[in-house]
Design a protein with these regions (language model features):
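Terminal amphipathic alpha-helical/low-complexity segments used for targeting or macromolecular assembly
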Residues: 1-26, 32
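Flexible, glycine/small-residue-enriched loop-and-beta-strand segment within the central core
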Residues: 24, 35-161, 166-174
């Protein structure tokens, strides 16, 4: 991990010229990373760290700050926006912003996940989406132990625990726990 050991070699110079690098001094690539043609790595908003053995399929767009864990895969056409952390051995596609994916979780297909926490070993079926903003722009309230709690946040998506699954076309409401 580059945050723990800054003396590791950055393999960014081995990236194919068909990959678009924006603010490349803020892009850090580990060993044996594959980045296919047409990928955009935009670190103008913060660093992008891609750990060892990750695989980025063609035409994915990744904006920093972002961390992609060891042996994870970012699928073709994915849009990974700012403030995303993806653990090791994950498969992520579709649109993702301001979210955390813990290790071994999958969201391979189309759909939106935003302002969310995805536990370990979670599988989100094709076209799973979450809302992260109420239509009236009010603060989000969630239910915990049969009690309504005001989060104080205008944006809050899905919080899904370890080993959870969703089927295809699942829609999660704003602030779903």
């Amino acid at each position: 991990n580059y945050l723990k050991n800054s003396s590791k070699e950055n393999y960014i110079e081995k990236i194919d010229s068909s990959v678009h690098l924006i603010n490349n001094q803020n892009i850090f690539v580990g060993e044996n990373v594959t980045i296919k043609p047409g990928v955009v790595l935009d670190a103008s908003g913060g660093p992008i760290i891609i750990d060892n053995n990750a695989f980025i399929y063609p035409n994915a767009v990744i904006e920093g700050p972002c961390f992609i864990g060891e042996s994870s895969k970012i699928k073709s056409g994915a849009a990974i926006y700012e403030n995303v952390s993806i653990g090791k051995v994950c498969k992520v596609g579709g649109e993702v912003e301001q979210s955390i994916f813990m290790d071994y979780s999958n969201k391979q297909h189309a759909g939106f996940i935003g302002h969310s926490y995805i536990g370990s070993w979670v599988n989100l079926g094709a076209d799973t989406n979450n809302s992260d903003l109420k239509n009236n722009y009010s603060k989000i309230k969630i239910k915990l132990s049969n009690k309504e709690v005001d989060t104080g946040s205008q944006f809050l998506g899905l919080m899904i625990g370890d080993h959870s699954k969703s089927s295809i076309n699942t829609m999660f409401n704003t602030g779903t726990v």
